[in-house]
């Protein structure tokens, strides 16, 4: 299994995001909301939505890099065949300067592992 984050594994189209928001199931913890929906493919695709309220662009981009890296390095434990949208919650925004990558990784992976059809 390759550890790259290829173009086909990204959610890019507005209609894909809207479909997940409309028909997807959700899981959440104190840091993230994860929406997911079966995609009929043999791989999962990831989309990330970070609101401007989260902070300036550098903070938003840093979080998106972290989420992509977590997805990329842990494809083996994330169920295949789903479109996944990750949305950070207010608590993560408030604590972002104090939490490290490993804490964010643990919280996100706990949710991603729970995805099921």
Curated annotation (Swiss-Prot):
Keyword RNA-binding attached: yes
GO function terms (MF aspect): 3'-tRNA processing endoribonuclease activity; ribonuclease P activity; tRNA binding
PROSITE patterns referenced in this protein's UniProt entry, alphabetically: RIBONUCLEASE_P
Gene3D superfamilies xref list: 3.30.230.10
One of the Pfam families matching this protein, by short name: Ribonuclease_P
Nuclease in keyword set: yes
GO biological process, any: tRNA 5'-leader removal
EC number: 3.1.26.5
Keywords assigned by UniProt, alphabetized: Endonuclease, Hydrolase, Nuclease, RNA-binding, tRNA processing
Catalytically driven reaction(s): Endonucleolytic cleavage of RNA, removing 5'-extranucleotides from tRNA precursor
InterPro entries: Ribosomal_Su5_D2-typ_SF (IPR020568), Ribsml_uS5_D2-typ_fold_subgr (IPR014721), RNase_P (IPR000100), RNase_P_CS (IPR020539)
Gene Ontology cellular component terms for the protein in this record: ribonuclease P complex
Enzyme class (EC, first level): hydrolase
Family named by the database record: Belongs to the RnpA family.
Stored PANTHER family: RIBONUCLEASE P PROTEIN COMPONENT
Record's function text: RNaseP catalyzes the removal of the 5'-leader sequence from pre-tRNA to produce the mature 5'-terminus. It can also cleave other RNA substrates such as 4.5S RNA. The protein component plays an auxiliary but essential role in vivo by binding to the 5'-leader sequence and broadening the substrate specificity of the ribozyme.
Summary of subunit composition and partner proteins: Consists of a catalytic RNA component (M1 or rnpB) and a protein subunit.
Protein name according to UniProt: Ribonuclease P protein component
């Amino acid at each position: 299994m390759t550890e790259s984050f290829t173009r086909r594994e990204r959610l890019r189209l507005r209609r894909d995001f809207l479909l997940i928001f409309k028909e997807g199931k959700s899981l959440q913890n104190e840091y993230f909301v994860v929406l997911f929906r079966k995609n009929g493919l043999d791989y999962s695709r990831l989309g990330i939505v970070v609101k401007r309220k989260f902070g300036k662009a550098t903070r938003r981009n840093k979080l998106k890099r972290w989420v992509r890296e977590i997805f990329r390095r842990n494809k083996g434990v994330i169920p295949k065949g789903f479109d996944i949208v990750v949305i950070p919650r207010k608590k993560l925004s408030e604590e972002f300067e104090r939490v490290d990558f490993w804490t964010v990784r643990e919280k996100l992976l706990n949710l991603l592992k729970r995805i099921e059809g």
